[in-house]
From Swiss-Prot:
Any matching Pfam family: PGM_PMM_IV
Keyword Metal-binding among record annotations: yes
EC number: 5.4.2.10
Keyword vocabulary terms for this entry: Isomerase, Magnesium, Metal-binding, Phosphoprotein
Organism: Azorhizobium caulinodans (strain ATCC 43989 / DSM 5975 / JCM 20966 / LMG 6465 / NBRC 14845 / NCIMB 13405 / ORS 571)
UniProt protein name: Phosphoglucosamine mutase
One cellular component term from this protein's GO annotations in UniProt: cytosol
Record-listed Mg(2+) binding positions: 101, 242, 244, 246
Active-site feature positions: 101 (phosphoserine intermediate)
Cofactor: Mg(2+)
GO MF: magnesium ion binding; phosphoglucosamine mutase activity; phosphomannomutase activity
List of residues that carry Phosphoserine: 101
Length: 447
């Protein structure tokens, strides 16, 4: 079904352009009506990251929810996974996170969570979309039933304690010098405090949000600053979160980046050794490196692949009973503990492995050599180039040449008229050659 407001991760857009206070007001009213079930007093928790527009959207949502009779609990700046956890913990009917994740400050978004802490299904989002466009004036609460709003104290400590409880009680990071980059985002308070409480020597960066600097040259999408800082202070490890802290990238003591694939390899091995894997495998997307798949196979584990997007990873985990999954970009989902990707929780699991091994991060977190990848795009104006006979022939020939030595992934973008062609394999020149052949065939058809 076509979507008007919701994308793959909630309602998102440029602040005060596509995502206005009026739209946020209507989202609050519509979502409140959709979850106002039964006779009990209904409540919604709202968290946000540190974007300037978060104040505007937060207040508009409060007006929307209270106008239809829902009480609002305001958390302030908190990681996305913390909002999911607190939605469950506070027995709320609904949770909301105001964030555009790793995007620049001028974007923002509204993510919704059900009472179980999971993001909403497509069906419920469709119901909310229909309500957004309705005349809701006749569904407003009576004056005596208008909701109340209040700020909740102590939520940072609750999330930190929750994060610490994912580790053994005697686990300590004493002796580890850790640089943590919070992207001037939602975790700027909780991440350094959690690491300090676990005994680490903590050096913080990206912890001075001003409403405009979220994700600006810091965080998981810009790890160069963290790499430089780790080398400068001779730290054992660096941790980079994104703006809403649902993804993480790690940097070893040499300043080398450890991506989500390597993090999943570390966690999968650790969980297997401890008997914590719910199945003999993990879930990742089609973009994860073939090197990860081969590593897991050598460990006696499988890799189940999904479409790109952490929501698809989580859907597969829930339907098939996996408890570890993620994306190369650093979304790591540990479903024994969290209902969404949680950068801090994933980092704690990796640090626990490092602390127990007493080996440098460069050894612990380099589980496999990634295969060379080549990614190229072709823009087209109309039609369906992938269905053309010449393109199909080029794809078949490319797959035949790669055979068991690599793989080819071709997918249209979900947001623009672009076809992405990704190849990977043992031989870089072969991979680049087959990708170029498919690209050339697509360009001729697209022209």
């Amino acid at each position: 079904m076509a979507r008007k407001y919701f994308g793959t991760d909630g309602v998102r857009g440029r602040a005060n352009a596509t995502l206005t206070a009026d739209l946020a007001l209507r989202v609050g009213m519509a979502a409140g009506l959709a979850f106002r079930r039964g006779e009990h007093r209904h409540r919604v928790v709202i968290g946000k990251d540190t974007r300037l527009s978060g104040y505007m959207i937060e207040n508009a949502l409060v007006a929307g929810f209270t106008s239809v009779g829902m009480d609002v609990l305001l958390l302030g700046p908190m990681p996305t996974p913390a909002v999911g956890m607190l939605t469950r913990s506070m027995r709320a009917d609904l949770g909301v996170m105001i964030s555009a994740s790793h995007n620049p400050f001028d974007d923002n978004g509204i993510k919704l969570f059900g009472p179980d802490g999971f993001k909403l299904s497509d069906q419920i989002e469709h119901e909310i979309e229909e309500l957004i466009d309705e005349d809701l004036s006749k569904k407003l609460a009576q004056p005596m039933d208008i909701g109340r709003a209040r700020r909740v104290e102590g939520v940072h400590a609750r999330y930190i304690e929750y994060a610490k409880r994912t580790l053994p009680r005697d686990q300590s990071f004493e002796g580890l010098r850790v640089v943590v980059d919070c992207a001037n985002g939602a975790a700027y308070r909780v991440a350094p405090d959690a690491l300090w409480e676990l005994g680490a020597e903590v050096i913080s960066m990206g912890v001075e949000p001003d409403g405009l600097n979220i994700n600006r040259d810091v965080g998981s999408t810009s790890p160069a600053a963290l790499s430089a800082k780790v080398r400068e202070v001779r730290a054992d490890v660096g941790i980079a979160l994104d703006g809403d802290a649902d993804r993480v990238i790690i940097v070893d003591e040499k300043g080398h980046v450890v991506d989500g694939d390597q993090i999943m390899a570390v966690v999968a091995h650790s969980f297997k050794e401890d008997g914590r894997l719910s199945r003999d495998g993990i879930v990742a997307t089609v973009m994860s490196n073939l090197g990860l798949e081969r590593y897991l196979k050598d460990e006696g584990l499988t890799l189940a692949r999904t479409s790109v997007g952490d929501r698809y990873v989580l859907e597969r985990m829930r339907s098939d009973g996996y408890n570890v999954g993620g994306e190369q970009s650093g979304h790591i989902i540990l479903s024994d503990y969290s209902t969404t990707g949680d950068g801090l929780l994933a980092a704690l699991q990796v640090l626990a492995v490092v602390a127990r091994s007493e080996r440098p991060v460069s050894e612990v977190c380099h589980r496999f050599d990634p295969l060379p990848q080549v990614l190229k795009n072709v823009r087209y104006s109309s039609g369906k180039p992938l269905e053309h006979e010449n393109v199909q022939s080029a794809i078949a020939d490319a797959e035949r040449r790669l055979a068991n030595h690599g793989r080819l992934l071709i997918r249209p973008s979900g947001t623009e008229p672009v076809i992405r062609v990704m190849g990977e394999g043992d031989d870089f020149e072969l991979v680049e050659g087959v990708v170029d052949e498919v690209i050339e065939a697509l360009r001729k058809v697209a022209a």
